[in-house]
Amino acid sequence: MALLLALALAVTGLHGIVTRWPTQPVCRVGTPCSAPAVGAVLVFSRRGHAAVTARAGAGGRYTVRLAAGYYAVSLRPPATIGGVKPREVRVRRGVNGRLDFRIDTGIR
């Protein structure tokens, strides 16, 4: 019974943290080289059409409900340099998976 209840309460989608990287031209040991991407908007698309968006909140955290399947991931507005990684994700039915995204700032 408990297993059935747990399965019924499972939310299909993703959650995690979005960071910007690098935040400075030279990364040094002991000095953070990334930062939470508060306010970043992730766009999850299927078959070339935007399915849903998620905005990173405090600490770069995001949560998004998605149907099971494969999605392309991009930023809104589109990144002129770098982009977001990973660019493709798979959502499994009945699973609320943890997936962190990194936005490449293009700083070198």
Task: Enumerate the language-model features and the residues they cover.
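Surface-exposed loops/turns
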Residues: 58, 67-68, 93
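A short, solvent-exposed beta-strand micro-motif common in secreted/extracellular proteins
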Residues: 69-79
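Short hydrophobic/aromatic-rich beta-strand segments that constitute the beta-sheet cores
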Residues: 44, 64, 73-75
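Structured interaction patches on ligand/partner-binding surfaces of diverse proteins
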Residues: 78-106
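Glycine-centered loop-to-beta-strand initiation motif
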Residues: 16, 56-64, 101
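Short, ordered, surface-exposed loop/turn motifs in non-cytosolic proteins
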Residues: 14, 20-47
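Short, acidic Ser/Thr/Gly-rich low-complexity loop/linker segments typical of extracellular
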Residues: 46-59
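Sec-dependent N-terminal signal peptides
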Residues: 2-9
